[in-house]
Amino acid sequence: MSSPRERRPASQAPRLSRRPPAHQTSRSSPDTTAPTGSGLSNRFVNDNGIVTDTTASGTNCPPPPRAAARRASSPGESPQLVIFDLDGTLTDSARGIVSSFRHALNHIGAPVPEGDLATHIVGPPMHETLRAMGLGESAEEAIVAYRADYSARGWAMNSLFDGIGPLLADLRTAGVRLAVATSKAEPTARRILRHFGIEQHFEVIAGASTDGSRGSKVDVLAHALAQLRPLPERLVMVGDRSHDVDGAAAHGIDTVVVGWGYGRADFIDKTSTTVVTHAATIDELREALGV
């Protein structure tokens, strides 16, 4: 491996792009404790390429496509299909992702941004994050370095959140169909689920394509839904970030947002075109899913 380049001066540090807060209704109250002192840019780009500034009121999140069929959970009824996000929802993957992110920036001689990196980089496609940091021609080299390091060691710096294994088993016993939709590369997602012994619970595992043609949550969910047809009347997305909510809303699907992930700051004073339920604990998630 080539040695790291000479480090940039601090005045030229790259700036992370932040995703917009997701829209929520108040079926239950979320934890609105936002991380402070990040020193990161307030200007960000969401999964659909919409640029928003957090210093302004409101957001520019696009509405769901007109053709999107309304397929959501019904009040008082358990879902028939649950689609899970991976990072921050099923597994605590922040340590490995942050470690490989640091490695990628060190490799090209770029300083690592200050602040809570997990809050800003875990969830969306890493190639989008790196390309939005103002790294210029070095962005592609950083992406290659990140992928190599994450494939070699970062993926294993990971753990299953407490209670996830039994929850999945109970959902399957109850006859609920299960799937995964993640912006992580699909082969890596399968590797992680297999490593934790939970791959067999999922009818479909949909992730980002390795050629970069499919990466946004909207596209990954479309890929998953196409494989899950015919779709039942009651289905729900379970995730931890705003792009999970926005991606599901684009397909007319409600979301349960878990409180143990990395997106607490995404859900402050916003509304949604679909229902957003907040589950702070695994027991609350069980209640929301009817098991």
Curated annotation (Swiss-Prot):
It comes from the Bacteria. Residues 23-60 have a biased composition (Polar residues). Changing K217M: Decreases affinity for ATP and autophosphorylation efficiency. Decreases interaction with PtpA. The modification Phosphotyrosine is found at Y262. Changing K270M: Decreases affinity for ATP and autophosphorylation efficiency. Decreases interaction with PtpA. Its EC number is 2.7.10.-. Pfam families: HAD_2. Disruption phenotype: Deletion mutant shows impaired intracellular survival within the human THP-1 macrophage infection model, and fails to inhibit phagosome acidification. However, the mutant displays enhanced resistance against oxidative stress in vitro. Disruption of the gene increases secretion of the thioredoxin reductase TrxB. PtkA-PtpA (TK-TP) interaction could be a good target for drug discovery program. Benzylbenzofurans and benzofuranamides disrupt the PtkA-PtpA interaction, which inhibits activation of PtpA and leads to the decrease in intracellular survival of mycobacteria. One of its GO terms (cellular component) is cytosol. Activity is increased by phosphorylation. It catalyses: L-tyrosyl-[protein] + ATP = O-phospho-L-tyrosyl-[protein] + ADP + H(+). Autophosphorylated. Can be phosphorylated in vitro on threonine residues by several mycobacterial eukaryotic-like Ser/Thr protein kinases (eSTPKs), including PknA, PknD, PknF and PknK. PknD and PknK can enhance PtkA autophosphorylation activity in vitro. Phosphorylated in vitro on serine residues by the eukaryotic serine/threonine kinase PKA. GO terms for molecular function: ATP binding; protein tyrosine kinase activity. It is an enzyme of class 2 (transferase). Belongs to the HAD-like hydrolase superfamily. CbbY/CbbZ/Gph/YieH family. Required for growth within macrophages. Catalyzes the phosphorylation of PtpA on the tyrosine residues at positions 128 and 129, thereby increasing PtpA phosphatase activity and promoting pathogenicity. Also phosphorylates the thioredoxin reductase TrxB. Interacts with PtpA. The presence of a phosphate donor increases the interaction affinity. Interacts with TrxB. Interacts with several eukaryotic-like Ser/Thr protein kinases (eSTPKs) in vivo, including PknA. PANTHER family: 5'-NUCLEOTIDASE (PTHR43434:SF20), PHOSPHOGLYCOLATE PHOSPHATASE (PTHR43434). Composed of two domains: the N-terminal highly flexible intrinsically disordered domain (IDD) and the C-terminal rigid kinase core domain (KCD). IDD is unstructured and highly dynamic, allowing transient interactions with the rigid KCD. This interaction modulates the accessibility of the KCD active site. In closed state, IDD masks the autophosphorylation site, thereby decreasing the activity of PtkA. In open state conformation, IDD is away from the autophosphorylation site, making it accessible for phosphorylation and activation of PtkA. This is Tyrosine-protein kinase PtkA. It comes from Mycobacterium tuberculosis (strain ATCC 25618 / H37Rv). The lineage of its organism: Bacteria, Bacillati, Actinomycetota, Actinomycetes, Mycobacteriales.
